[in-house]
Every structure is written in C-alpha cells, then in structure tokens.
Amino acid sequence: MAAKIRREDEVIVITGKDKGKRGKVKNVLSSGKVIVEGINLVKKHQKPVPALNQPGGFVEKEAAIQVSNIALFNAATGKTDRVGFRFEDGKKVRFFKSNSGTIK
C-alpha cells in the first residue's frame, strides 16, 4: 500500500501537546509513526564522549509521533487536506481531495 505521508511533506499536528504546529516530515517509520522537524521535542540525557569532544548533559531532539495525529498541509488552501491516489501517464500520484491538486 502506498504511503499517504512521505518524507519532506509539510504537515500540521491535529491533536496532542503540539496541536496546530506545522513542520516538515524528516523520517517515516514502519511502525506507523513519523518524525517531524521541531515537533514533539523531548529532553534526552547524553553521556559525555571525550574521544569525540562531546559534552554530556541534556539534549533536545524530536520524538516520533503517530501518523494519525498529523494531517497533510495544502499550501493552495492554507488548510489541512485529505490525500487520494490516481494514475497520470501510467504513474501513481498523490493528490489533494479538496482541489485535486497533485502533490509534488
């Protein structure tokens, strides 16, 4: 089955502590989760690595978020949108359901 959300897609969080925030998808995990830039930040403890001259302490990084908690952002309408699939010139492409615009 083709993925409705892919890397580099612009998405909006629709539920949770980061509701309403927008970001780009950095990674899509096979477990039904995605990592989005600047969304769902968590603080991790990091040990110092003297060989690499890395200090220890707290590091903020993005944690995975369920794909059901995000929606694709349609720049043409300025809102979230649903995704459909269709064939154009023998290739399967994604499109926005509200205005039928093809997604890059």
Curated annotation (Swiss-Prot):
Cited InterPro entries: KOW, Rib_uL2_dom2, Ribosomal_uL24, Ribosomal_uL24_CS, Ribosomal_uL24_KOW, Translation_prot_SH3-like_sf
CDD domains: KOW_RPL26
Lineage top rank: taxon: Bacteria
Record-linked PROSITE patterns: RIBOSOMAL_L24 (PS01108)
Gene Ontology BP annotations: translation
Cellular component, GO, one term: ribosome
GO MF term set: rRNA binding; structural constituent of ribosome
Pfam families linked: KOW (PF00467), ribosomal_L24 (PF17136)
Keywords: Ribonucleoprotein, Ribosomal protein, RNA-binding, rRNA-binding
Quaternary structure note: Part of the 50S ribosomal subunit.
Function: One of two assembly initiator proteins, it binds directly to the 5'-end of the 23S rRNA, where it nucleates assembly of the 50S subunit. One of the proteins that surrounds the polypeptide exit tunnel on the outside of the subunit.
Similarity remark: Belongs to the universal ribosomal protein uL24 family.
Name by which UniProt lists this protein: Large ribosomal subunit protein uL24
Native source organism of the sequence: Buchnera aphidicola subsp. Acyrthosiphon kondoi (Acyrthosiphon kondoi symbiotic bacterium)
Gene from which this protein is expressed: rplX
